[in-house]
Amino acid sequence: MRQTATALDDVVVVGYGTQKKINLTGAVQSINSKDILRANVSNGSSALQGIVPGLTAVQSSGQPGNDQASLKLRGLGSLNSSTSPLILIDGVEGDFNRIDLNSIETISVLKDAASASIYGSRASNGVILITTKRGYEGKPTVTFNGYVGMNTPTTLPEPATAIEYMQAVDIARQNALQQPLYTNVIDIYKNGGVDQINYYDTDWRNEVIKSSALVQNYSVSVSGGSEFIKVFASAGYYSQDGLIDNNKFSRTSLRLNSDMKINKWVKLGIDASVRQANATSPVMDSPANIIGKALTMTPIMSGINADGTYGYGINGTNPIAMVRTGCTSNSTAPEYIIKTSLTITPLKGLSIYGAYTWKRNDGETNAFVKPYDTYENGAFKGSFPTTGSSMSDQRTKQVRKQYDLIGTYENTFGKNYLKVLMGFQSEELNYTYLVAGRKNYYYDGYQDLNNGDAATMTNSSARHAWAMLSYLFRVNYSFDDRYLFEVNGRYDGTSRFIGNNRWGFFPSVSAGWRISEEAFWESAKNVMDNFKLRASYGLLGNQAISSYYPYSASIGSSTGYGYWFDKEFSPGVAQTQLANPDITWEKSHQFDIGVDYAFLKNRLSGSFDYYVRNIDDMLQQFPVPLFVAMTSPWENAGSMRNNGWEFSIAWQDRIGNVDYYIKGNISDVKNKVINLYGKEYKSGTTLTTEGKPYGSWYGYVADGYFSSREEIDASPVYGGNKANVAPGDIKYKDISGPDGVPDGKIDSHDRTIIGNPTPRYEFGLTLGLQWKGIDFSAFFQGVGKKDVYYSGAGARALCGNYTIYKYQFDYWTPENPDAKFPRLLEDPNATNPNNMISSFWVKSGAYCRLKNIVLGYTLPSSITKAAHISKLRVYASAQNLFTIKDNFYEGFDPENSVSSGASLYPLNKTFVFGLNVEF
């Protein structure tokens, strides 16, 4: 890892072109292919987690092919529109999780208005540019990269055994002044009475969730060419088995990127890629809900009978049967992309680039349901689901066409450097959807749509289209490589708005000062190689709301709108949503000031940024009078602010034969809703209101436990009936009343903001070294501050039909007054006052995770040359190896925490062995 003075001369991919890193005036983060592949992950969202300061990447699920990853750049960008960055793969919008990571050359993250405004109305939430690999002039190189390994859950809660569960229920009943229910049954269990016919001890977790699942990934590529033609071709295959039966995902990818030199001033590019994803999952419920059932159902319920038949579970709901009966949803999603480009350089410094891209995404999902039979106590209990057998067939098609025409002029005049870019882009998208279904399939093996009962047939379809037309420009000027100036602008027109609101102009301006190039800095050059100040301001837009025609009235058809004509009923249509032709773009005014630095011959380098994002004209829907009987229209009304900072630092050096590096970053963002025009967004657990962060946790403020009857008699209690409250129950604070002052009651007036779910102080730390062919790296990622509200089984024992977990036995008793949980109570209807939404159930979601660790060995070339191999590396890697948590619930993961408790697909702890070979 030898350092050179050219480190800062690296070229960075920016919008519609490239720039030298030293000349950047915007906030741009670049990631190379080595950093991407080091983690050995299957999708791009996970590859960026913890690497890019300011980028929040949250993986909410470990489900194969559906990790529900969310990306947010510099905080939340909208209330009702898209909040994800614009992701462009070779200039065309795409899905980060659908691309083979082995084919990626670089990723550039455009964070501020200066770098992103050239993408105008779709860049409000930032832009991620993905550039795939291309061929080079020289002897062809064949590269193979593959690994195989196992996934296991990062963590799972441990449910109680049947005896422990029944003992807990009896204690809860005694606390409620009720007679114990299981005294005699417990004795039967203790004396070996469990026979899985009349008495059950079902380990739902181990019956449904597998201890490990296979994961494998293989990629082979060829790159090379001559002066006149260069080619990069790759093929990839990825497969992941799920942690439950009948759950699997696979992806096959093919790519061909070619560049042809027609003559000295004309170049032709032809790129083609094909990808197909296949997914299988149980059809009777989502995999996450099935796992949730397995983690919450009580052990005394029948799961598997002694003769192998399925138990009755909860009124026929049996997650074991759901995953094992073979009733699955099978989906296929092919993607085809063809891109042709022509580059003309008629004059020195002048380049004209034109491209046409055609992209098609298809989807086909077939789901078949066959009821399973259940038995309990030796008797048949029924078939479930009770609706009988059914089948559905769903088809989607999406076609995107994009035209680009970009002209670039670049020249140097003495100490003056000028680069001007102007362009045009047209894009259109067409989408169709069709689904059909039937019920009552009486014979196995005839799972075709037309074999169902025609009298039960259903069908539905949808269609929408969208188009944009854009004009764009950028001007870069620098003097003596010291004073940098850049102006960007884009003029967008979209089909989502009409009239004068259809078009919007989104400009930005930025400047940089390389102080280290000044004469007065010369004495400090030996210590500080580069020091650059930069600042930017600009306007970005957002038009990506859920509706493709938000300005128009909506028309719906229904028998309820019909009318009788000559004793015959005819269905009708009616307006269902009010129109508003005056709506327009959401706007984001962004300011950024930053510094880039490099010390000690570029061994120590990094950057710092402070930014403010003011989001205005947010799209909302306000209530209309009930007699209107229609959905309210969209309106531009509301504003929000994000402000934060980002810091990154890296040290890389060599000691003897050891090359080593340390890279770290940390960032923070604060969100504040400025103006909602008097509206509040209030759900059961969250509140969005003016002056507070979006989606703040909202509930009562807990004040410990009641310790005595005297304390209860002297305090206000929830509901007002003190006879329903006992020592060991949660005590709530009386903080307000109808007049805004405490009134001696605990009611809805005492609800307030009790936590902030926005992650704060996100960080990443990478350590690595190389020594005589051995390479090692470890990557830590985490969140310094986040509030998580939990309900359901994850927090509340015996709530609803839930079981109790081992860690929940730390409940209040007179002998255990500092317990983690209040006194035990059954709560079949979820009305227990202890289970109110309160700060008691808000826990710290802060964590630090060893996200990835890799140990590899590259064989000496003296050995591999004999086999005509230029490089051979073997490695072992582990992901999510351990997590340090801040008093979080045992068995639950703070990264994919959800407020509903246990209905989630656990994240994966992965162990793989891999091989890299180059010929």
Q: Where are the regions a protein language model picked out?
A:
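Short, small/polar-rich motifs associated with maturation and membrane association
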Residues: M1-R255, M260-N263, K267-D271, R275, ...
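A structural detector for beta-sheet-dominated domains
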Residues: R2-T4, V58, R74, G638, ...
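Structured loop/turn residues at beta-strand edges in well-structured enzyme cores
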Residues: T6, G26, G50, N97-E105, ...
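Extracellular/periplasmic, surface-exposed regions of secreted and cell-surface proteins
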Residues: D10, I36, S84, R251, ...
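Extracytoplasmic assembly/pore-lining segments of large envelope/extracellular complexes
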Residues: R98-I99, K359, T374
